[in-house]
Amino acid sequence: MSEAYKNAGVDIEAGYEAVKRMKTHVERTKRAGVMGALGGFGGMFDLSELPYKKPVLVSGTDGVGTKLKLAFLMDKHDTIGVDAVAMCVNDVLAQGAEPLFFLDYLAVGKADPVKIESIVKGVADGCEQSGSALVGGETAEMPGLYTEEEYDIAGFSVGVVEKDEIVTGNSIKEGHLLIGLSSSGIHSNGYSLVRKVLLEDAGLDLHQTYEPFKRPLGEELLEPTKIYVKPVLKQVKAGKVDGMAHVTGGGFIENLPRMLPEGLGVEIDNGSWPVPPIFSFIQEKGQLKAEEMFNVFNMGIGFVLAVKEDDLVDVIRELEQDGEKAFLIGRVQKGEGVTFGGGSLS
């Protein structure tokens, strides 16, 4: 042990203890293709063990943003890792790829082995939900950059798809229909606005329970991001999906056009799905316009599929059989951007 380093704020022994605690969680994410063990300089994966003829790797990286601030305030760290995984694997999924492996980066103000284990448990939970192996990562103790209670987490996902099965959105045409999959809540974006509206302006207490919720506000806000990989991949592999969008920062307005060919837009049937109460709660407390809400939040739809009309009924039925709540929320039309029909946004 380096006493000088410890006195400078870096506890090597605590770091070793954290790694030891991680191992059982990492172990349960192993899958076909994983090589080596935790602790090597690099994670290894053998693609030849998988039945892909012309594999294309698809990668994604992301973080959790200021949702972390709520985890600090609630001293609740066991689900924030799920968010880190979800933000990455849902992006990879949007290209039709099966997530293979994941790496995490955790920067902490102070190495607390119990807290780090709790965070990594969440990462492993997310990896299990998505079929990803947690093959490595980095935990950096950074005194002076973060307070002892603070940390940041980011992730990196790699997936694979057959070259001729990549979902690019290029085959989407006017008349394609949009299936929206329900979100679990706010997911992992818009939290700077959430904190300003609910905590700074309204002065609400994260530990209190407010109507219409049945648990403390902080727990409601920390509900982890839903991972859509397994049910959606079944539809992708069946050839029934022509485009996908992960509804994250920028909401419907920014994310739906990302899957569309040039010259096409979408019309969303406002009111065609139930909006979770957390969004109306935020809108009311902040006196926010509906346009603002749709420009920031997922509004209850976390992932969108573009399908042909002939496939609509089968895809919705099969998604619901797999436990998803799926809704016909709109259609592709000529033009640009996102328009709303079926109900006012005011």
Curated annotation (Swiss-Prot):
Query: What keywords does the record list, in alphabetical order?
Result: ATP-binding, Cytoplasm, Ligase, Nucleotide-binding, Purine biosynthesis
Tell me yes or no: is Coiled coil among this UniProt entry's keywords.
no
This enzyme's EC code(s): 6.3.3.1
Keyword Cytoplasm part of the UniProt annotation: yes
GO CC term, one of those recorded = cytosol
What are its GO biological-process terms?
Answer: 'de novo' IMP biosynthetic process; adenine biosynthetic process
Q: What is its main location?
A: cytoplasm
Catalysed reaction(s) here are: 2-formamido-N(1)-(5-O-phospho-beta-D-ribosyl)acetamidine + ATP = 5-amino-1-(5-phospho-beta-D-ribosyl)imidazole + ADP + phosphate + H(+)
Q: In which pathway does it act?
A: Purine metabolism; IMP biosynthesis via de novo pathway; 5-amino-1-(5-phospho-D-ribosyl)imidazole from N(2)-formyl-N(1)-(5-phospho-D-ribosyl)glycinamide: step 2/2
Q: Which InterPro entries match?
A: PurM-like_C_dom, PurM-like_C_sf, PurM-like_N, PurM-like_N_sf, PurM_cligase
GO molecular function annotations of the record: ATP binding; phosphoribosylamine-glycine ligase activity; phosphoribosylformylglycinamidine cyclo-ligase activity
Q: Where in the cell is it found?
A: Cytoplasm
Q: Which HAMAP family match?
A: AIRS
* Similarity field: Belongs to the AIR synthase family.
Q: What is this protein called?
A: Phosphoribosylformylglycinamidine cyclo-ligase
| Species name | Bacillus pumilus (strain SAFR-032)
